[in-house]
Amino acid sequence: MSKYEFIKIEKKWQEFWDNNKTYKVIEDPNIPKEKRLYILDMFPYPSANGLHVGHPEGYTATDIFARYKILNGFHVLHPIGFDSFGLPAENYAIQTGTHPKKSTEENINKFKKQIKALGFAYDWDREIRTHDENYYKWTQWIFLQLYKKGLAYAKEMPVWYCPELGTVLANEEIIQTPNGPKSERGFHNVEKKYLRQWVLKITKYAERLLNDLEELEWPESVKEMQRNWIGKSTGVEIDFEIEGYNDKIKVFTTRPDTIFGITYLVIAPENKLVEKITKDNFKSNVLKYIKQEELKSDLKRTSLEKDKSGVFTGSYAFHPITNVKIPIWVGSYVLGTYGSGAVMGVPAHDERDFQFAKKYKLKILPVISKSGKNEILEKAFINDGISINSPDEFNNLKNSEVKDKVIKWLTKNKKGKETVTYKLRDWVFSRQRYWGEPIPILFDKLGNAIPLEKNDLPLKLPETANYKPSGTGESPLSRIKNWVNVKDTDFTRETNTMPQWAGSCWYYLRYLDPKNSKEFANHKKIEYWMPVDLYIGGAEHTVLHLLYSRFWHKVLYDLGHVNTKEPFKKLINQGIITAFSYQKENGVLIPNDQVIEKDNKFFDKKDNKEVTQVIAKMSKSLKNVINPDGIIKEFGADSIRIYEMFMGPLTDSKPWNTKGIIGVFRFLNKIWNLREKELSKDNPPKEIMSQLHKVIKKVTEDTEKLNFNTAISAMMIFINELSKYEKNYLNIFKPFIIILSPYAPHLAEELWEYIGETPSLFKNSKWPKFDETLIIKETKEIVLQINGKIKDKILLNKETDEEELKEIAMENSKIKSNLFNKKIVKIIVIKNKLVNIVIK
């Protein structure tokens, strides 16, 4: 029996695909739009660690779908590139003393080697790298379009600054912890600092970013996260005059029906009125409070915790309708960047305001009650009801009627107006780091910004050995004086660089025309391919990359550079591949290399105490990161591809278990060993012909729906049936090779050649069609149980034997998920009825 030499086979076909450019695609105008597909992965950041087994999950999913569609006659664009600018490369360079350009190139080469070893059907002629001058030239050009459209501006503003990273971070890059705000990357301390920043007016597109979500085939959870991040509120902006000042405080509210219950106002610490209106004898308290609160993140300040703090300014405002004096407070739970930076306190009808009023002994005035009468309030009344304690024309009415009357009164008397606000803030676009796109702006002596012309692009990132952060908040570029000061002029260059999100905002467009030196992409090529039909990547990018790229795309659409309103038609978030970790009794996770196994139990080497096996995210500190290189060497790329898809539904998180790949490897060996049988051109028995059409149907339907795990399960069942026959029937084997090929392309190509066909299979075959009339309906419903409780029901061939039933049951995803950390006592099989797995 000839051995399944997967290393030799995979190397052979990877070289064949490369040499013959099997997956190269060009724009053929004769192919109709409905037969074109743009399938895309979120491109990787080339870290020094290389790929781990979690990376190929999404790539394998798009690869299977792309190959399946190619075999179904579709013209498929499936490109790859590298998101190679940004903080991680620079931090790695600082740690190792290797220039980021050199280390990035080395890491890309490592990633490419690993990606190619997995046999993905990428068109490598379209490869892009965001740090390449010919790429970031167009990133800079798009920034200039934003600037010319009035969507990019520079301003002094309070921003999050990370001393450790040496740069400003956007709100989206800050996470709140019990120990204060931290940087998302590196988990470092951050502080507030006033710096001149470039900002993009994403808020101008808030309404469209919100409304156009309805047109997208995206997970509802992702759409909801974007809706919440954009945070649209419809209400009224009310003007409050300040006693003794000509200034007004503008307050936005969605509850104008509670206006007569206002007993205080709160303004944000950043509000410029704070310094002006705070009375002298209150100033020290106010300044102390602001200093105390300034390190809290926006998320912490606006969290749902009811215990909010504040301090009185000593000043008062006038109620716009009743003219009653209202005390003005400063409170950090109000953000200067959201709405008008002020809120009205209505403690009788808002739980947060109620707690605030109780804490500071402020008046609580109910103006709505269920009965229309005064009632003792033990907590805020937030429901609909009848108005009370209000001026006559507003009293004894449903609160919905009061709302309408108040809006009309405020509008008529020019004390307020209906308006819409958003939580979304403009995007802080500057970074005080070296490894990023230089911002193509000059400044004259007066500080006026002057955009570079197109023919001055790219503004190249200057070479320097001194790329470390300055520590002062200035960019490392500011130290390169002969670059900052433009020769023979009085102009100076902007020294901040763009954030790492800049290059990823539009990369999907550059794939369409990566070698174009005259424009970012030819318009005809954009019309040919856009939008992206299927985009697969992690949900962690919901309010960063996915929101930013939608914004840039809409700007390009408005300028006539792209033909679609949205870049990504359908989005799928793959689940996280986790790994086994080990937890001590006190809940602490310990590194995997600190654990030993004895008699199916796990112990800490240091103290010999038993630990519990748990599932956790892969991390270097836990030493549970699994590199695919070793897996490929031991089992092959086709094995890892099929195993990752077989672990469970694509969108579910699931734990990696290297033992699980052995079953997949056996499956591929079983297919390979069919070569040992006579390859017969005889007509196959009707039973196996029926099974063939059944598996073609199942794999077709499941692959179309991205249900790869169940498609693989069907192929495994079929191969068990096919292996029972003495002959290997060509009319059976050939179509099976084709349906296997998206999943195990290397093995499929080898078998395609073995049966005498011309490679590549992906150029010289078509996806087989199933014939319902040939499918014999001799199946039985088998119940799968654990300890007598039904977990799943499946249809199987009546002739499936006991051992196969056991194997199928054990590989069932609903059964597998219930067996984690359990001991199997016995497996009871009743043929054509049930499989019951007894565990303890």
From Swiss-Prot:
GO cellular component terms given for this protein: cytosol
Catalytic activity: tRNA(Leu) + L-leucine + ATP = L-leucyl-tRNA(Leu) + AMP + diphosphate
UniProt EC number: 6.1.1.4
Residues at which ATP binds: 620
MF (Gene Ontology): aminoacyl-tRNA deacylase activity; ATP binding; leucine-tRNA ligase activity
Sequence motif: 'KMSKS' region, positions: 617-621
Stated name of the protein: Leucine--tRNA ligase
